Amino acid sequence: MTQKIDYFFGLGSPWAYVGLDAFTALATAHLADIVPHVIPVIEENGGIYSRNRPPLRRAYWFTDLKRWANRRGVTLEFAGREALSDIAPAGDLVVAAWLRGDDWLALARAFHQAFWGRAEDIGAADVRARITTEAGLDSVSLEAFAKGPEVAARKAESLEIARKAGVFGLPSYIVVGELFWGQDSLPFLDSHLKGEKLIA
């Protein structure tokens, strides 16, 4: 039977970007279906945005992020990020792509690479359109669909699913009720999908 992985992430999460290729390779190896849920950090469940952490913890977070980026072979660009606009519309396009049966994963990867790898302003309509087109999707129709009720309903549904499942930080992965938080938990997710016992 095909296994399903509920994948909770946001384009604003550098950890989702850093772990994306490793996660998708894992899912492919297990022939698992990925069900995407584009959500924010859930503070009521204990999630903490990096900007709200104490300076020393934030400094360590930054160092660890760079370590993992190097380990995963991905580029991070932090210069000029303060000028970037709201990326929520780009996330809506990813949701829209999934709902329409388009290649949402290619689009999410393209947005991640643009936002975190090159510090592009994916909140800008013209930048979104270019990236969407380069990912092989129809940017005009997708933008129109993303503004519709189906996408709003799906976002609300995903957030409620995440809240009830105990998701707090991003990325998170759930397989049959078992929650794994963070891209550094992928080895545990791999073992779980193999049917291995993780807790004695």
Please place each PLM-identified region on the residue numbering.
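Structural alpha/beta surface segment adjacent to cysteine/selenocysteine redox centers
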Residues: 11, 17-115
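Generic structural motif recognizing short loop/turn segments at the entrances and edges of beta-strands
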Residues: 1-3, 74
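C-terminal cap of thioredoxin/glutaredoxin-like
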Residues: 3-6, 12-32, 106, 110-200
